[in-house]
Swiss-Prot record:
Source organism of this protein record: Oryctolagus cuniculus
Name of the protein in its database record: Cellular tumor antigen p53
Family the UniProt entry places it in: Belongs to the p53 family.
Biased composition (Low complexity): 76-85
Compositional bias ranges of the Polar residues kind: 306-315
Entries under PROSITE patterns matching the protein: P53
GO BP term (any one): oligodendrocyte apoptotic process
Motif segment ([KR]-[STA]-K motif): 368-370
Start and end residues of each stretch annotated as Interaction with HIPK2: 317-358
Sequence motif: Bipartite nuclear localization signal, positions: 302-319
Cross-referenced Pfam families: P53, P53_TAD, P53_tetramer
The encoding gene: TP53
Length: 391
């Protein structure tokens, strides 16, 4: 301990008296003085000191106002904040399907075709529905009262008919999308195609994501009253992953070169394997419900010729009675009685048809009486056997 204290006593402690000795040890060409003097002189100039002393003390305590914000310079693309990722929801806007003839009297028409099994495309005026096969030609006629302006286009778009499916986009099923049936113009996911027109343009809407096909409007040829466009439907209505048995509508619109609407019309479509059979079945079901055919406004009826099928009208017209008599040979008494009663009933019905409404009651009572006589005539008599214990 004594040796350590003696060593410390040899060196004087650092204090203000030792600062002068340390200052003398610095080299003569000191670089610190040349680098620090100019800034010190600038910060403590005589004018600044005088202004600072003459300044109002209250003003010195005030907080300086914030400088006015300058106009922000255009940020570089790399420094811009990334926009939030936009999702791809279902389309929010649903195209209108209401008929609109416009100033040019725009209407649709279809060729006449029956309900035979061999037909590939048939139109039902009562249902306003087109039945067609997959990828088969469907002629649609465009009728106008006056010629539209140059640059007019015709757009075809498919939407779902029911309200719960209207917001979804109609597209082909994955199986048919992979089929090698492309014509080089139509995208594989588009349902409707135009046949035989190289000027067809297939569009995908940016806002609604719906598919449509647009062709330039061509006036009718010489000797023709309408313009015909041949459409193809490239997926069945029953395909899983596509329409999936959901009914669809095809909306045909007439637009000018700027996209303004000039006319609109629509019809239902069913793509199936047997159009004639399906049309006949749906028309029968429609008539069984007792619903009348929807009356379209004047000028909007589809130009389809009436069908000549036997079931086209629920009530057949009565033919006038023929006065000629016929002789029918019938084998067997029972069968003869049945035909005789039927003939008498028909004769009575014809006789009472032009009389008062009470004739129907007399007709029914007459039939009951005749039926009772005929049945009692052929019934075997039933006898009660009397035994020894009977009364």
């Amino acid at each position: 301990m004594e040796e350590s204290q003696s060593d410390l006593s040899l060196e004087p402690p650092l204090s203000q008296e030792t600062f002068s000795d340390l200052w003398k040890l610095l080299p003569e060409n000191n670089l610190l003085t040349t680098s620090l003097n100019p800034p010190v002189d600038d910060l403590l100039s005589a004018e600044d000191v005088a202004n600072w002393l003459n300044e109002d003390p209250e003003e010195g305590l005030r907080v300086p106002a914030a400088p006015a914000p300058e106009a922000p310079a255009p940020a570089a693309p790399a420094l811009a904040a990334p926009a939030p990722a936009t999702s791809w929801p279902l389309s929010s806007s649903v195209p209108s399907q209401k008929t609109y003839h416009g100033n040019y009297g725009f209407r649709l028409g279809f060729l006449h075709s029956g309900t035979a099994k061999s037909v590939t495309c048939t139109y039902s005026p009562c249902l306003n529905k087109l039945f067609c096969q997959l990828a088969k030609t469907c002629p649609v006629q465009l009728w106008v009262d006056s010629t539209p302006p140059p640059g007019t286009r015709v757009r075809a778009m498919a939407i779902y008919k029911k309200s719960q499916h209207m917001t979804e986009v109609v597209r082909r099923c994955p199986h048919h999308e992979r089929c090698s049936d492309s014509d080089g113009l139509a995208p594989p996911q588009h349902l409707i195609r135009v046949e035989g027109n190289l000027r067809a343009e297939y569009l995908d809407d940016r806002n609604t994501f719906r598919h449509s096909v647009v062709v330039p409007y061509e006036p009718p040829e010489v000797g023709s009253d309408c313009t015909t466009i041949h459409y193809n439907y490239m997926c069945n209505s029953s395909c899983m992953g596509g329409m999936n048995r959901r009914p669809i509508l095809t909306i045909i619109t007439l637009e000018d070169s700027s996209g303004n609407l000039l006319g609109r019309n629509s019809f239902e479509v069913r793509v199936c394997a047997c159009p004639g059979r399906d049309r006949r079945t749906e028309e029968e079901n429609f008539r069984k419900k007792g619903e009348p055919c929807p009356e379209l406004p004047p000028g909007s009826s589809k130009r389809a010729l009436p069908t000549t099928t036997t079931d086209s009208s629920p009530q057949t017209k009565k033919k006038p009675l023929d006065g000629e008599y016929f002789i029918l040979k019938i084998r067997g008494r029972e069968r003869f009685e049945m035909f005789r009663e039927l003939n008498e009933a028909l004769e009575l019905k014809d006789a009472q048809a032009e009389k008062e409404p009470g004739g129907s009651r007399a007709h029914s009572s007459y039939l009951k009486a005749k039926k009772g006589q005929s049945t009692s005539r052929h019934k075997k008599p039933m006898f009660k056997r009397e035994g020894p214990d009977s009364d």
